[in-house]
């Protein structure tokens, strides 16, 4: 409610995709991180049909292909992702396995566009980290067929499993470059 009272969270799926596409000039180089939110909103389909150079990681067939596209994504004009959680004060909390998504968030692409559902909003950083460990990570481990305790129990065990996807924890307090990170908060539950 506090976010809505500030005029946030009143964008819905169709408007979110339209808003995000409005940032992209023709021919822009665009990359993305793994995200159920981008899939559920239709953003991925929209990017695949847009007049852009799309670095689509879904086409990668080998680990070498993935490494190259992750590297090239750091030089993209625009990088699309969701966030694992965000506080009511606007801090972003992301926990990553490979680090490619948080690397792009921190540095590299000229612009970062984040689509996030209201279910990602937490009171503070501690609650946001808990949200990731108790909701996002277990569900992602199941989806990705990871052999982790949380994929079995649904609860984070703070594991150090070889399949662990909680390898980097990044809290973004603000963007060092004004306007580089754009958050589109969607008034629906999306992603994990």
Task: For every predicted segment, state its role.
Residues 13-14, 34-40, 85-89:
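Gly/Ser/Thr-rich loops at beta-strand to alpha-helix junctions
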Residues 16-28:
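Glycine-rich phosphate/diphosphate-binding loops that line cofactor/substrate pockets in enzymes
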Residues 1-8, 12:
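Single conserved hydrophobic/aromatic residue that forms the stacking wall/gate
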Residues 73-192:
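Conserved phosphate- and dinucleotide-binding cores of soluble alpha/beta proteins
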Residues 16-18, 39-41, 102:
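Short, well-ordered alpha-helical microsegments
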Residues 26-80:
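A glycine-rich, hydrophobic loop/mini-helix early in the fold
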């Amino acid at each position: 409610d506090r976010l809505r009272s500030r005029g946030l969270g009143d964008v819905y799926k169709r408007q979110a995709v339209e808003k995000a596409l409005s940032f992209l000039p023709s021919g822009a180089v665009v990359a993305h991180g793994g995200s159920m939110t981008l899939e559920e909103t239709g953003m991925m389909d929209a990017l695949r049909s847009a007049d852009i150079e799309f670095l689509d990681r879904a086409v990668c067939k080998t680990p070498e292909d993935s490494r190259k596209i992750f590297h090239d994504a750091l030089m993209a004009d625009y990088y699309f992702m969701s966030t694992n959680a965000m506080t009511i004060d606007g801090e972003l909390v992301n926990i990553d396995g490979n680090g490619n998504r948080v690397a792009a968030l921190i540095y590299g692409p000229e612009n970062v566009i984040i689509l996030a559902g209201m279910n990602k909003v937490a009171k503070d950083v501690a609650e946001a980290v808990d949200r990731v460990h108790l909701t996002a990570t277990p569900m992602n481990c199941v989806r990705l067929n990871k052999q982790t305790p949380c994929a079995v129990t649904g609860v984070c065990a703070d594991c150090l499993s070889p399949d662990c996807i909680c390898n980097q924890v990044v809290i973004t307090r603000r963007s060092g470059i004004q306007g580089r990170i754009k958050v589109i908060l969607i008034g629906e539950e999306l992603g994990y």
